[in-house]
Amino acid sequence: MTSYENHQALHGLTLGKSTDYRDVYDASLLQPVPRSLNRDPLGLRADALPFHGADIWTMYELSWLNRNGLPQVAIGQVEINATSVNLVESKSFKLYLNSFNQTQFESLEAVRETLERDLRACAQGDVSVTLRRLEDVEGEPVARFSGDCIDNQDINITDYEFDAALLSGAAGEETVEETLVSHLLKSNCLITHQPDWGSVQIHYRGPKICREKLLRYLVSFRHHNEFHEQCVERIFNDITRFCQPEQLSVYARYTRRGGLDINPWRSNGDFTPATGRLARQ
């Protein structure tokens, strides 16, 4: 259990509770979660964050009505800057998107502007929204994370409780720049404890990281309860603390739930995330 799992800021969330689905636009359905909940225990201050980054959401189930009442569909991408005061709780995001279903909008741009305005208000920070028609997306190939996959190691694991100390002694003598990938990241929703499945890409320059120790550390998230964004910041913080790289970027792409996938990245260098969906997305 995290130190803030029962924090009062989480008590009012619809997540984990029976809710009615509304199909008429309602911005009040969006619910914020303060980023400070997990940052404070990690010693991360909003005015001195050791990283920059964003939470990239893909919206696969977005529909509304045009002025003639004809349903419209699009696929959207949302980028919420990591400097925002809040992250957006995912079930509330899903309920909010459902409220577009029977609402008329003048145009695709009107939908985009509405999404951007409401999400900025909820996150209290910079948000950008891009919408694409299906014909602009069809035929795009499934992407893959570049880098060396560390998953096929012949090691025994019997403990699946989170332990940052598994990274202790992981930094070697040799200085390298490399990209490591694992598809074995699995954590659990902070509230419902439903499993969240993800792939993670770690690019760094600095003391060479022991791949066995890194894999054991990533697998230890298996029983850990935290939101996607919080897990990525924890990974960034722990690798920084134990391995002290000169430069570090951590990027995770999670499988979708409720028509949404969440793909957070954090970096202290020059990093541009590839946004193509992976095989499990």
Swiss-Prot record:
SUPFAM superfamilies: Tetrahydrobiopterin biosynthesis enzymes-like. Signal peptide: none annotated. It comes from the Bacteria. Pathway: tRNA modification; tRNA-queuosine biosynthesis. One of its GO terms (cellular component) is cytoplasm. Its EC number is 1.7.1.13. It is found in: Cytoplasm. The keyword tRNA processing does not apply. Coiled coil: none annotated. Substrate binds at residues 88-90, 228-229. The active site is at 189 (thioimide intermediate), 196 (proton donor). It is an enzyme of class 1 (oxidoreductase). GO terms for biological process: queuosine biosynthetic process; tRNA modification. Disulfide bonds: none annotated. One of its GO terms (molecular function) is preQ1 synthase activity. Keywords: Cytoplasm, NADP, Oxidoreductase, Queuosine biosynthesis. It catalyses: 7-aminomethyl-7-carbaguanine + 2 NADP(+) = 7-cyano-7-deazaguanine + 2 NADPH + 3 H(+). NADPH binds at residues 90-91, 257-258. Catalyzes the NADPH-dependent reduction of 7-cyano-7-deazaguanine (preQ0) to 7-aminomethyl-7-deazaguanine (preQ1). Homodimer. Belongs to the GTP cyclohydrolase I family. QueF type 2 subfamily. NCBIfam families: QueF. This is NADPH-dependent 7-cyano-7-deazaguanine reductase.
